[in-house]
Amino acid sequence: MNKILLQQCQSIIDPTLPPISNISNLLAVIFYTYDINWVGIYDYTDKHSSLTLGPFQGKVACTRIPYGHGVVGTCAKEKHVLCVEDVHTFTGHIACDSNTNSELVIPLIHDDQLLGVLDLDSLHLAYFSKEIQSTMERVAVYFTDELFRCKHV
């Protein structure tokens, strides 16, 4: 599945389109590939002490997450991948959807600058395997490139 997903993601990137179009399609591919209930981007700028909801697939979501809080904010602050098998045991977890049980959050970093995070949620405990995490880290490069383009167009 990894190879096919990576090929799909690469093939839908169209540099002639606005970055938001590419980001939206990438999220749709992920949403319909995995057994997840939510996937989206949280945008980060130094102007705010929070991450702001960007494009996503799934239920209505939290619109602002404080930097350093919850899984998303902690990932942003620490600038490393967080894979949480049971979000209910994560100190300070912010429950945008109380049915979510596991979460994978990947920082989107360009030239040592945090641009945002890619957030995936699942209803299943310990859903995100090492294989899924590895694949999503590779896919995150596309999101980083498009988010950088968004901020510098």
Go through each PLM region and give its residues:
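Sensory-domain boundary capping and coupling elements
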Residues: 109-122
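Short hydrophobic/aromatic beta-strand element in the GNAT-like acyltransferase core
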Residues: 38, 105, 117
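Regulatory sensory and allosteric helical modules in signal-transduction proteins
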Residues: 44, 50-96
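Regulatory loop-to-helix N-cap segments in sensory/regulatory domains
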Residues: 121-139, 146-153
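A short, aliphatic-rich beta-strand micro-motif
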Residues: 102-109
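Intrinsically disordered, low-complexity terminal regulatory regions
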Residues: 1-56, 138, 146-153
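Short loop/turn motifs at secondary-structure junctions and domain boundaries
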Residues: 33, 96-100
